[in-house]
Design a protein with these regions (language model features):
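Active-site helix-to-loop segments that bind/position phosphate- or nucleotide-bearing substrates
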Residues: 1-171, 177-181, 193-195, 199-206, ...
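A short acidic, leucine-rich amphipathic alpha-helix
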Residues: 70, 285-290
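Short amphipathic alpha-helical interaction segments
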Residues: 147-148, 292-307, 320
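Glycine-rich/acidic phosphate-handling loop/turn and adjacent ATP-lid/helix
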Residues: 184-221, 264-266
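A short, conserved structural fragment
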Residues: 243-245, 306-317
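Short alpha-helical segments that sit at the start of domains
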Residues: 261-276, 307, 317-321
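Short capping segments at the starts of secondary-structure elements
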Residues: 278-283
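Short, cationic-aromatic polyanion-contact patches
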Residues: 313-329
Length: 329
């Protein structure tokens, strides 16, 4: 049985299974040790591997720390099932609003693995469930603009994974990604750490809740560990012409709210669908035109256009008829 104890501010894992080679990502560990030898030469010279692991907080008295587990184990959730990410894409602007086919979620995924793996999988989830605005410039060149700046999304997810509370009190609380029609929310347990206030975020150097974890990810070139995450988010949203991210810390949680700015009544992508439907179109034709899943297209685009009076159904008394077509109102 797994026994968790606190010692010197570190969570220790009395789990012999982690010591088995097949439970450790050996390639990641070697990358890390190579970086230590290169970047921390005063540490690496004449110091054995086991001593490096102790000094850098990966192990304590030969036992892996929680930080070490979350970075170097192939599957940390074998020990802590809820130290993961739950990600959902929703059809409306609030939880509980159902979509065209009464679905509660357009997409839902539990993202597991070590922190570097969860980060990449979470960014991929957001990409998959994001709309793309196509812009044609004066020279006829096409450019695709994502719903959310990818670099900012990555920083927000990384911040949630690195700075969340990993104490025994919150080990059953995943990081949450909730993609609504008009915004995305990224939520982690723990609230703000130390004396910093919301207004000071990105302006002053904060205290670090999980310093050893941040240092490991810095040496793996996953985070800069220079407190640049929030300024990067703000800058990326400004460059994209989107509202600045909103940060809040209430009820022991830290939340980032990112508004997409793509869902006004004059949204060009929606208008292109309306024009496409100048000729009555089937669901399949509209799905092919947009290039997204049926649930996504119907829940986030077609159904709102029908409710907004921009499209009408050719068989309004049988909305789910297989012969249904949609035409410009």
């Amino acid at each position: 049985m797994l026994n968790v104890e606190l010692s010197g501010g570190k969570t220790l894992l009395q789990a012999d299974a982690f010591k088995k080679p097949n439970m450790i990502d050996e390639a990641r560990m070697e990358t890390y040790l190579s970086a230590v030898r290169k970047e921390r030469k005063n540490l690496a010279e004449n110091v054995y591997k086991d001593e490096i692991l102790e000094l850098m907080g990966i192990t304590s008295d030969g036992v892996p720390t929680l930080a070490g587990l979350m970075v170097f184990s192939k599957y940390p959730q074998g020990y802590f099932p809820q130290l993961c990410i739950t990600a959902v894409s929703l059809p409306g602007t609030e939880m509980g609003i159902v979509g065209y086919d009464d679905e509660r979620f357009i997409d839902s995924k539990r993202i597991t693995g070590a922190i570097p793996d969860m980060l990449e999988d979470a960014v991929s989830f957001v990409r998959k469930n994001s709309r793309i605005k196509t812009i044609i410039d004066d020279n006829g060149h096409r450019a695709d603009k994502p719903e959310y700046p990818v670099k900012a999304v990555r920083e927000a997810i990384l911040n949630a994974l690195v700075h969340r509370d990993y104490s025994i009190h919150t080990e059953n609380v995943p990081v949450r990604i909730e993609m609504y029609r008009d915004r995305m929310e990224i939520i982690n347990s723990g609230g703000l750490y130390g004396k910093i206030s919301i207004d000071a975020l990105g302006k002053v150097r904060p205290e670090t809740r999980n310093a050893a974890l941040a240092n490991m990810l810095e040496l793996l070139n996953i985070t800069e560990n220079r407190y640049s995450g929030i300024p990067t988010m703000r800058n990326e949203f400004a460059k994209a012409g989107l509202p600045a991210p909103i940060f809040s810390a209430v009820h022991g949680e830290f939340k980032v709210i990112m508004k997409n700015g793509l869902y006004s009544d004059e949204e060009p992508a929606d208008e292109s669908v309306v024009e496409f439907c100048s000729t009555p179109r089937t669901r399949a034709e509209i799905v092919d035109f947009i290039g997204k899943s049926k649930n996504y297209v119907m829940s986030k685009i077609v159904n709102p256009l029908v409710k907004g009076g921009k499209l009408r159904m050719t068989i309004p008394d049988k909305p789910k008829s297989p012969n249904q077509r949609f035409v410009k109102a």
